Design a protein with these regions (language model features):
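Mid-chain, well-packed structural core segment of small domains
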Residues: 76-100, 104
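Short, intrinsically disordered/low-complexity patches at protein termini
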Residues: 44-46, 56, 69, 84-85, ...
């Protein structure tokens, strides 16, 4: 869960290698709510029988549901309040299901102070029963404008 307190970082406060993370327990209700909100009611996301017939364990969470969780990290933790998302590129190498515990991580890869631009690396992995990293479920890059 993302805390309600928003971080307020100026471009000069953001350093290479800075990391923000969260652990998220995926709930079936979130998948259903996202299907309604987005209008993406593809049976792969909302029909367990169909998803299983297609070779999946159950309904697959929308990739952009993970993207929305990353958005919460950007807007609340790193870079925080002054973040204006300009570009987001994500790949989803493995499926996510209700009940999965996902570790999302954002890392500062580059800071262009003169332009007010920050590049972030994003990753998400399933956690095992022992909180060990498992398969990667999302990876990508984000470019944010840091407002003054």
């Amino acid at each position: 869960m993302i805390e309600d307190k928003v971080v307020d970082l100026d471009i000069t406060d953001i350093e290479l290698g800075t990391v923000a993370s969260l652990v998220w327990q995926v709930e079936a209700e979130e998948i259903t709510a996202f299907a309604e909100l987005s209008g993406d009611r593809n049976p792969l996301h909302v029909d367990g029988e169909y998803a299983r017939s297609a070779g999946y364990q159950s309904e697959v969470a929308h990739g952009m549901l993970l993207g929305a969780k990353f958005s919460g990290l950007f807007g609340m933790k790193l870079p925080g309040k002054r973040c204006l998302l300009l570009e987001q590129t994500l790949a989803y190498p493995n499926p996510v299901y209700a009940g999965d515990q996902i570790a999302l991580k954002v890392e500062v890869r580059d800071v262009h102070s003169e332009l007010g631009i920050v590049e972030l690396k994003v990753t998400a992995e399933k956690l095992s029963d022992f909180d060990d990293p498992g398969p990667q479920v999302a990876r990508g890059k984000v470019i944010c404008k840091i407002l003054s």
